[in-house]
Regions:
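Flavin-dependent oxidoreductase catalytic cores
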Residues: 1-138
Length: 138
């Protein structure tokens, strides 16, 4: 899998350029937000890319990567669908401050009312992702 850096030290050096340039928030996209960025350092349940970026820079971060879905985005370009995935882990990580915001992609393409359903607590009304959503205009 593609990674920006092989270690926290490499990531810190990469991010330093942005911090010194005055960036005030980092949007940290990875294919599956729930995966640890440096598993060898802090285990399978370790910080994701946004968590490490926040830890290393002190800046607010946005996590994104298959939020609410079970497979990564590249399958959508091959016409593959994706089942919904519970939001428990993203909520827990957000509440403990691992990252500050959450970006959502395909789940919103599938259902433009996704955020309203989440806000209302209607998780059971969330839809699986169908690649045809890429061709749908609401």
């Amino acid at each position: 899998d593609a990674k920006l850096a092989e270690s926290p030290q490499e990531l810190e050096a990469f991010l330093r350029v942005f911090v010194e340039a005055g960036v005030d928030c980092l949007h940290c996209s990875q294919r599956r937000f729930w995966e640890a960025e440096f598993e060898a350092v802090d285990g399978m349940d370790g910080l994701n890319l946004a968590g490490w970026a926040k830890k290393l820079t002190g800046l607010p971060t946005i996590t994104v990567g298959s939020v609410g879905l079970s497979t990564e985005f590249t399958g959508a370009f091959r016409g593959e669908s994706s089942k919904t995935r519970p939001l428990t882990d993203v909520i827990e990580r957000l509440e403990r401050g691992e990252f500050d915001m959450v970006g959502v992609g395909r789940a919103l393409l599938q259902d433009p009312f996704w955020a309203q359903k989440i806000f209302a607590g209607n998780f059971e009304d969330l839809s699986d992702y169908d690649a045809a959503a890429l061709k749908t205009l609401y």
